[in-house]
Amino acid sequence: MRTSEIAKRFLDYFEQHDHLVVPSASLISPNPTTLFTIAGMVPFIPYLMGEQTPPKHRMASNQKCVRTLDIDEVGKTTRHGTFFQMLGNFSFGDYFKEEAIHYAYELLTTPQDKGGYGFDPEKLWMTTFTDDEEARSMWKNEGVDPEHIQIMGMEDNFWTTGGPGPGGPCSEIYVDRGPKYGVEGGPIADENRYIEIWDLVFENYEVDNVKSKTDLHIVGELENKNIDTGAGLERLAYLMQGKQNIYETDEVFPVIEAAQKLSGRTYGDDEAMDVRFRIVADHVRSALMIMSDGVRPSNNGRGYVLRRLLRRTVKAMRELGVTEPVMPTLLPTSKAAMEPSYPELNDTFHDVSEAAYGEEDAFRRTLESGTEIFDMAVTKAKQGGSDLVSGEDAFKLHDTYGFPIEITLEMAADQGVKVDEAKFRELMAEQKSRARADALKKRHNVDLSVYDDFKKTLLQPIDFLGYTDMSARAKVLGIMQEGKGSVPAVTGPANIEVILDRTPFYAQAGGQLADQGEILSDDGAVLEVDDVQKPIKDLIVHQCRLTEGTLVVGAEVNANIDLERRGAIARSHTATHMVHKALREELGPQATQRGSEDAPNRLRFDFQWSSAPSKDAMNAVEARVNEKLRENLAVTTQEMKFDDAIALGAMHLFGEKYGDIVRVVSIGEDGWSRELCGGTHIDHVGKIGAINIMSEASIGSGVRRVDAVVGQGAYEFNAREHALVSQLSDMVNARPDELAERVNMLLAKLKESDRRLAAMYESQLAASVPTLVAEAKASSAPVKVAKKNVGHFGSFDALRKTVLDVRGQLGEDAPVVVALAGMNEDGKPMVAVATNEAARKQGIKAGDLVRGASKVLGGGGGGKPDFAQGGGADATKIDEALEALAGQALKG
């Protein structure tokens, strides 16, 4: 029975028993403290805790889950996996223990031809909580052999949330796999032979003061008792399919089969290699499912977990002997295996695959550059009589070559050495400390504690008025200078930081740049406000230039923002929301915000997307925004509960912390765009005028950036573009509507000229072959060196072809080195070197020769022993480089 059919039977059974079947929730956990959905009951926690009313009091689901705490153990055993599916039935104040036990037993033991799972009742064992005589009696009533009902304590068979809330005893169902898997005696005796497949939790107590599983306080019984069960789908699958473990099931093993074909190895021949096969099978599936829920590789949070899964896959395949890209084979294989259960995988697969392929390409380059350095670090340690790779070397691998410490640790373990992790962590901490110090210096401060100390003196929070007021009367609460605590007074000219009791100035946040303006005191002090920041939560600090007079603490002032700048930034910020919405309409819901900057007349928007959107797609985004501008949609703001905002469909940033009450900015009466946002906006989008997308490019793995001009910036761009078109039309003697055709014609002519020039260079190279061969053969030196400065050579392929041609004609009668150097189309010097087998037997390697020659040219290079290439910056030293190379070759 296929895994998808096992899941379907579970859901069909409980639907027939009046349960509402709900689809799996996203793997992205709604809880900001948890990266992923880690258990089947997670989406139902608000119902179990009594915080929300469920749509029905009986529910069932097949929930996708990811746990990566044991990622290092994956593959080493056949029981660990990062992605799994949890079947569950739930009751919220409806049925309780007796029905839950009956449902589970009936589904498990009903024959398969009658819709059940067909487990032999004699193979089933149950564990129950010490004090739960009621559950034991109910199992007996179902016909379970009393000898198969075992008793366990609080540690194993009592469930809590880990804090105050519901709790209760549980009963676990096990399957006996037979004597070849271990000793008899039930789950208490051997959990390798007896495999847990289903856990029934009976929540009937209110628990308080949970210190540990064995140290908790039961307050009393719950008014509404709940049922929370979880059956591991993968475990059910391998037992029902007659397999040995989860890796041999129909949803996982196809990836192992694909890895076998790529590697030429056979799963089961070698345990060390089997570990790699299992890592690949598990991680590819996990990565596929995580990416399908919108996560993309990054350096933090969920994105980093995903990145690690993909990188461990590539590394494991390399250890299986595969150096070419593997994701284009493995990912579609996993998708085909999982699609019967998740047909929606097809909807996002194009973007998912692009992200995975791009991540693999980047990591393969990292592996190629870092592996050699790692090997050198291991050699250095062993030559020093140590089995410890230094923390300095591990840090260099991480900092210079982008080699993740996890990969370094795994490779070290594979080679039987360790890594000085303590020193590595120390160096990482020092680097972070330097980065924080640099950031503080950029804010003209050395220590945030001065702000913390000042904030403690405030009697009430600072009042931000900037949503409605552009100027305000205020009182000076504090003056800071040179990163020191508040001073009573400062006389200008001076650079100072000013804290007011109330302010219309917007502090930089959420991508929106700060307001600028002026502060004028009643006693004559004049301050130009250049920037406004929140160095710590809820403290608004105005960074000012005191140009006239003396400012004293307690002074009454007028605070006036620059209205023109505020308006320009507000237009950009509203336009950013519109670009975000239009991108999601054009590309799909995975195009989510990763960052932004809203400045006067321009915006920058970073979004999650793995591949370059087409030019047509970006044109459509621009056109869509301008269409909405012409509709002059209203912009409204409203404060509401976070859950209510999400229910309305408001966009928010995953990983961002929000309060219970949030501010929602909506564009259009029907909420065409709706986002959680604390920034400033215009009241109607028509005031933006126009937007032009200037560029779209990658700024990192899986992250793209849009730069656009807005309002006056867009008008100025259009004027410049019109002038440029007129100028180009005059230059090529064509009307504006003929410009593209005329430029294409000129480019075609240029391409033909380049082709002829390349053919000439290639002909010249070919003509030099007979002379090079003859001169080398005539040489009496122990190593035949054929070298030449060919001048301009056109394409490097032609140079490489000539080098290999000369080597082939010189044969294997004597050691041969062929070295040609010249200038590419950019005038940069390059060198190509080939050696024959006779030379390599004497230790003469092309890579070594190229490195020496490239050093003379002021550059670098490398390659394999039989062929290598390099280059530099100083073309005047080509002859010198060739002479140095020849001398090195003759020394052997």
UniProtKB/Swiss-Prot annotation:
EC category name: ligase
Species in which this protein is naturally found: Bifidobacterium adolescentis (strain ATCC 15703 / DSM 20083 / NCTC 11814 / E194a)
Keywords: Aminoacyl-tRNA synthetase, ATP-binding, Cytoplasm, Ligase, Metal-binding, Nucleotide-binding, Protein biosynthesis, RNA-binding, tRNA-binding, Zinc
Molecular function terms, GO-annotated: alanine-tRNA ligase activity; aminoacyl-tRNA deacylase activity; ATP binding; tRNA binding; zinc ion binding
Function: Catalyzes the attachment of alanine to tRNA(Ala) in a two-step reaction: alanine is first activated by ATP to form Ala-AMP and then transferred to the acceptor end of tRNA(Ala). Also edits incorrectly charged Ser-tRNA(Ala) and Gly-tRNA(Ala) via its editing domain.
Cofactor note: Binds 1 zinc ion per subunit.
Pfam families registered for this protein in UniProt: DHHA1 (PF02272), tRNA-synt_2c (PF01411), tRNA_SAD (PF07973)
Cellular component terms per the entry's GO annotation: cytosol
EC number: 6.1.1.7
Domain notes: Consists of three domains; the N-terminal catalytic domain, the editing domain and the C-terminal C-Ala domain. The editing domain removes incorrectly charged amino acids, while the C-Ala domain, along with tRNA(Ala), serves as a bridge to cooperatively bring together the editing and aminoacylation centers thus stimulating deacylation of misacylated tRNAs.
Designated name of the protein: Alanine--tRNA ligase
Gene3D superfamilies: 2.40.30.130, 3.10.310.40, 3.30.54.20, Bira Bifunctional Protein, Domain 2 (3.30.930.10), Threonyl-trna Synthetase, Chain A, domain 2 (3.30.980.10)
Catalytic activity from the UniProt record: tRNA(Ala) + L-alanine + ATP = L-alanyl-tRNA(Ala) + AMP + diphosphate
Family the UniProt entry places it in: Belongs to the class-II aminoacyl-tRNA synthetase family.
Principal subcellular localization: cytoplasm
GO terms of biological process kind: alanyl-tRNA aminoacylation
UniProt binding sites for Zn(2+): H573, H577, C677, H681
Cofactor(s) the record lists: Zn(2+)
Subcellular location: Cytoplasm
